[in-house]
Swiss-Prot record:
UniProt-recorded name of the protein: Transcriptional regulator GfcR 1
Single GO MF annotation: orotate phosphoribosyltransferase activity
Gene: gfcR1
Organism: Methanosarcina acetivorans (strain ATCC 35395 / DSM 2834 / JCM 12185 / C2A)
Domain remark in the UniProt entry: Contains an N-terminal DNA-binding winged helix-turn-helix domain and a C-terminal regulatory domain (or effector binding domain) resembling phosphoribosyltransferase (PRT) domain.
Family membership noted in the UniProt record: Belongs to the purine/pyrimidine phosphoribosyltransferase family. GfcR subfamily.
Pfam families according to UniProt: Pribosyltran
PROSITE patterns: PUR_PYR_PR_TRANSFER
Keyword Transcription carried by entry: yes
CDD domains: PRTases_typeI
Biological processes, Gene Ontology terms: pyrimidine nucleobase biosynthetic process; regulation of gene expression; UMP biosynthetic process
Keywords associated with the record: DNA-binding, Transcription, Transcription regulation
Length: 204
């Protein structure tokens, strides 16, 4: 994306294609609040100040299986470094749909672990209190397992928190979260260490 007008145009295009706010946020790697602002601004209704957010475009990595492979190796190295400190092992790598899946499947292969897939609730436009995402039954089980959570970007940390809570409710042990970009700048979420290739910290 070149500028704010490109982001607005892409957000409107995605909405016209049937994506809901959470899915648009995931696709553009921005918060739901930013998507709402982009869509409101496209209608030129009211001048509302822009939320403080950063759009991350990692498509130059995502379009190449070779680049994804090398990035997954770097994330594996960081995950193993974290696990060594606690003498923990990894049983299952949990990919957060949709953007965490390619990296998670490659990491599971590299780490010799099972692969599980988590469908977040962010794909729903209206999220009811207590509503949760789900672990797909078509992939590995997480029950009683040591888990590594993999996603592309942490924006507010809400999806990561959702996955951690869901895994714990299922008797799993989330050991580390691995992401390409951490926009929240947190060392941990719910006492689970965060490993990111890039950490963004706002200074304003």
């Amino acid at each position: 994306m070149k500028n704010i007008e490109d982001l607005i145009q892409k957000a409107v295009e995605l909405q016209n294609n049937g994506l809901v706010t959470g899915q648009i946020a995931d696709e553009l790697n921005v918060s739901r609040e930013t998507v709402t602002w982009l869509l409101t601004r496209s209608k030129k209704e009211v001048a509302v100040p822009a939320p403080k957010d950063i759009s991350v475009n990692w498509s130059s990595i995502g379009k190449s299986a070779t680049r994804l492979h090398y990035i997954s190796l770097a994330l594996c190295d960081m995950v193993l470094e974290t696990l060594e400190k606690t003498n923990a092992e990894v049983d299952v790598v949990v990919g957060v749909a949709a953007s965490g899946i390619p990296l998670a499947s490659m990491m599971a292969n590299e780490l010799g672990a099972d692969f599980a897939l988590y469908h977040s609730r962010k794909g729903q436009d209206v999220v009811q209190p207590g509503q949760k995402g789900t672990i797909s039954r078509n992939f590995g089980s997480v029950v009683g397992k040591n888990c590594v959570i993999v996603d592309d970007v942490i924006t507010t940390g809400s999806t990561t928190m959702e996955v951690i809570e869901q895994l714990r409710e299922m008797g799993a042990k989330p050991r580390v979260v691995a992401v390409l970009v951490d926009k929240k700048g947190a060392d941990t979420i719910a006492n689970v260490p965060i490993q990111s290739l890039v950490r963004i910290v706002r200074v304003d």
